[in-house]
């Protein structure tokens, strides 16, 4: 058996040279200007394989749509966001008077801590009547840890925000489970699904989410198609117009699913 003396003299032979690994990117900050004139400032993680390092067009567009429809979508309502990243739609929902907002993303410590940081950044513009919570959540898991944030007597949400989540078509069944478990069975409850096909050749796969939703007790309505001024990634391949386009859908319980 080798002993410690056998390895004397190697020193730093197997030590990685300085600069061998690229330095970790520093966090950056971005701002979302609300229609009300208020500014939501968020920190973006320096880099992350789950894309928490960007403020996506779908997030901005969802936030603006929620603000425009605040009286019917969020005022006094309970809101859940999945795949929130920086959490702008959640924060805007709280600012516009939602009763409860639960902001979630994959239960990665960096993502969750960053969401908490962003919630605290906007605390001064959130009314005292609104409560904003942050949690890690893996799509398809039980929702009871999320509904635990709701006021006594409530066990589901009026609004489910799903911005740029349908890109992962393998996760479509789990996203359907989230809607089935978390969305209140009411004609007024709605899931807001907003996305941009950053890889346009995968758009048909993205869109398979909607017939799957219809097969599982929901009705789907396309509500907007907004072309942004410029693409998020200038050098990416694929149709440039599609990469600038944000698609918006509302998903509600089909009438035959309501009590």
UniProtKB/Swiss-Prot annotation:
It holds the Pfam family Methyltransf_16. GO terms for molecular function: N-terminal protein N-methyltransferase activity; protein methyltransferase activity; protein-lysine N-methyltransferase activity. One of its GO terms (biological process) is methylation. Keywords: Cytoplasm, Methyltransferase, S-adenosyl-L-methionine, Transferase. InterPro entries: EFM7 (IPR025784), Methyltransf_16 (IPR019410), SAM-dependent_MTases_sf (IPR029063). S-adenosyl-L-methionine binds at residues 56, 83-85, 105, 139, 163. It is found in: Cytoplasm. It is an enzyme of class 2 (transferase). It comes from the Eukaryota. SUPFAM superfamilies: S-adenosyl-L-methionine-dependent methyltransferases. Its EC number is 2.1.1.-. One of its GO terms (cellular component) is cytoplasm. S-adenosyl-L-methionine-dependent protein methyltransferase that trimethylates the N-terminal glycine 'Gly-2' of elongation factor 1-alpha, before also catalyzing the mono- and dimethylation of 'Lys-3'. Belongs to the class I-like SAM-binding methyltransferase superfamily. EFM7 family. This is Protein N-terminal and lysine N-methyltransferase efm7. The gene is efm7.
């Amino acid at each position: 058996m080798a002993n410690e003396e056998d390895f004397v003299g190697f020193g730093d032979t197997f030590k990685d040279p300085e600069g061998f690994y690229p330095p970790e990117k520093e966090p950056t900050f971005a701002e979302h200007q609300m229609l009300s004139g208020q500014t939501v400032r968020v920190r973006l993680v320096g880099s992350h394989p789950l894309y928490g390092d960007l403020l996506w067009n779908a997030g901005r567009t969802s936030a603006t749509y929620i603000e425009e429809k605040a009286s019917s979508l969020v005022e006094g309502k309970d809101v859940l966001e999945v795949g929130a990243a920086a959490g702008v739609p959640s924060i805007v929902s709280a600012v516009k008077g939602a009763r409860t907002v639960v902001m979630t993303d994959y239960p990665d410590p960096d993502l969750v801590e960053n969401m908490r940081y962003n919630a605290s950044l906007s605390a001064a513009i959130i009314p005292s009547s609104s409560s904003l919570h942050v949690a890690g959540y893996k799509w398809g898991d039980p929702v009871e840890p999320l509904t635990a944030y709701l006021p006594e007597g409530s066990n589901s949400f009026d609004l489910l925000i799903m911005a740029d989540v349908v890109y992962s078509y393998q996760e479509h069944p789990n996203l359907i489970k989230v809607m089935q478990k978390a969305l209140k069975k009411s004609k007024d409850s709605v899931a807001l699904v907003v996305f941009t096909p950053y890889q346009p050749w995968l758009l048909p796969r993205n869109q398979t989410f909607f017939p799957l939703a219809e097969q599982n007790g929901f009705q789907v309505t396309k509500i907007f198609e907004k072309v942004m001024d410029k693409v998020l990634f200038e050098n990416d391949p694929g149709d440039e117009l599609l990469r600038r386009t944000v698609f918006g859908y509302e998903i509600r319980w089909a009438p035959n699913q309501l009590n």
